[in-house]
Amino acid sequence: MSEISTALSEDCPCQSGHHYADCCGKFHLRQAFPETAEQLMRSRYTAYVLKNIPYIVVTTVPSQQTLLEPRLLQEWADNTTWLGLEILKTESLTKTQSAVEFKAIFQGEECEQAHQERSIFVKIEDRWYFVDPTVSLPTMKQPCVCGSGKKFKHCCGGFL
């Protein structure tokens, strides 16, 4: 977490225009929780920039956290240089589900590259979480990963 403490007085890597301490830093230090899906998206991007993999894990929907491989996430973070984040669109899908489309710029082996994605976020007990589409997901008739009690196809699965 030493990268976090040195970043507190700097501009936030999420490019919100705020200092890290007043932006994603308060989420990383668990002084507050993101109030919107976009704030969570920005804080997760910043966590990757700062190589704060524990934050990536705890902000993934709880039912998926044990499916993540922190060692692989750490290796990926260690080998990636992030250069910028652009939020393209934020959508409120339901009262507890939102989508954030973003473009993240990173240094590739030979040139800058961009990763564009539409991520789904779900609010569980007043906290936002990322629904990770890269891990095993339930079948459409199984209960949703968010714990809503609905079938996956009628809940988060309908947005992935």
Curated annotation (Swiss-Prot):
One family name in Pfam for this protein: SEC-C
Protein origin, superkingdom: Bacteria
InterPro entries: NTF2-like_dom_sf, SEC_C_motif, UPF0225, YchJ-like_M
UniProt family annotation: Belongs to the UPF0225 family.
Protein name: UPF0225 protein CGSHiEE_01665
Organism: Haemophilus influenzae (strain PittEE)
